[in-house]
Structures are given as C-alpha cells and as structure tokens.
Regions:
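Hydrophobic ligand-binding cavity/cleft-lining segments
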Residues: 2-74
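A generic structural signal for beta-strand entry/edge sites
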Residues: 4, 28, 103-105, 131-135
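Extracytoplasmic/secreted envelope proteins and their assembly/folding machinery
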Residues: 41, 48-54, 94, 123, ...
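Solvent-exposed, acidic/flexible segments
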Residues: 37, 47, 90, 156, ...
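Short, surface-exposed coil-to-beta transition loops
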Residues: 30-32, 91-95, 118-123
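Glycine-rich portal/gate segments that line the openings of hydrophobic small-molecule binding cavities
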Residues: 3-5, 42, 56-57, 65-115, ...
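Beta-strand/loop substructures that line and gate deep hydrophobic ligand-binding cavities in soluble
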Residues: 107-165, 170-172
C-alpha cells in the first residue's frame, strides 16, 4: 500500500511541476523559414496560390499518400477550402485561403480537428530577387491555451524542421 501511495505522490508531483512550468511558458509561437528558388516570381507565386499543389511539397501532407482530400470553392481565390483526413501523423483538418496579395503573399487559416483542435495561420510570401530568382518566406503562427502551451517546448523545433523540408521540396519542384 505504501508503494502505491509513493507512486501516486510522485505522479502528482510531476503533474504539479508541469502545470507550474506551463504557467511560465509562452502561449504562442511564430516560426519563419525562407528559401531562394531559381525561378521567376510569377511561376513561383502561381504555383503557391493553388492549395492543391501544397500536397506536392508539404512535409505533413506527404506523410500519408492515401489521405482523403475534399475541396470547396475555386482553388487560388479567397475562400477556397482544402480539407483532409489521414493517418495519425496527418490527422484531420482544413485550410482556407483568407487573403491574397497578387505576386506577394497568400494567407491561410489552418483548422486542425484531429488529433487535437487548434487554429493556426500560415503566410507564404514571395519576393523577386532577379528575373529568375525568388525568395519564398513561409510563416506559421498559433497559440495554445494553458496548460497545453507546455507542448510548445517540444513542438516548435519540429514545426520549423517540417517547414524547412517543405520549402526544400518546393524548390526541387519549381527548379525542374
């Protein structure tokens, strides 16, 4: 019986410790990654504007080639919604085009449903460096409420890594 009480006390102590840490952990994140693509700005922007193309380079989307996709609206314009349902790594959610500044940026809202509920925001911006060179900046931001914000200590690095891989895949596709 004493062993059970000791185990419960240790477990309770760990939980209390994590809850205290979460009090002092930031509630949101904003991650930015960029890459230079050897292709004209218009070619890059036209490709990015079509959310259906994101399956070709997005690290998360490529993790489950058999996921189910649904589309609502016209791709490449504000209001288009791309929804997916896949394995545990991909989960379930939808992405909606919220704003487009032609030749400059595409803003989307991502609404995750499974394995957890979360709303995030993504911005893809393009900048012409020369006639045949474009800088692409990918930004991702969201917030987590207490006590789930403690997860930010672990996931921020992983999100940044996935973003870098996605941009490298995008570069490979557009430089062919």
């Amino acid at each position: 019986m004493n062993i059970l009480i000791d185990i419960l006390l240790v477990l309770a102590s760990v939980i209390v410790f994590l809850l205290i840490v979460a009090l002092f952990t930031k509630k949101g994140y904003s991650i930015h990654r960029e890459i230079i693509i050897n292709a004209p700005l218009q070619k890059v922007f036209d490709y990015l504007k079509q959310l259906k193309n994101w399956d070709n380079f997005n690290e998360r989307a490529t993790a489950d080639p058999s996921k189910k996709n649904k589309f609502r609206g016209t791709d490449g314009i504000v209001g288009f919604i791309y929804a997916w349902s896949g394995n545990k790594k991909v989960g379930e959610g939808e992405k909606e085009i919220k704003a487009i500044v032609e030749g400059k940026s595409i803003e989307t809202e991502i609404r995750f449903i499974k394995p957890f509920t979360l709303t995030g925001y993504t911005n893809m911006s393009t900048e012409s460096l020369s006639d045949n060179q474009t800088k692409v900046t990918l930004s991702n931001a969201s917030t987590l409420k207490y006590p789930l914000n403690i997860l930010l200590l672990m996931v921020e690095k992983g999100i940044g890594k996935d973003m870098s891989i996605s941009l490298s895949c995008l570069k490979n596709i557009l430089e062919k």
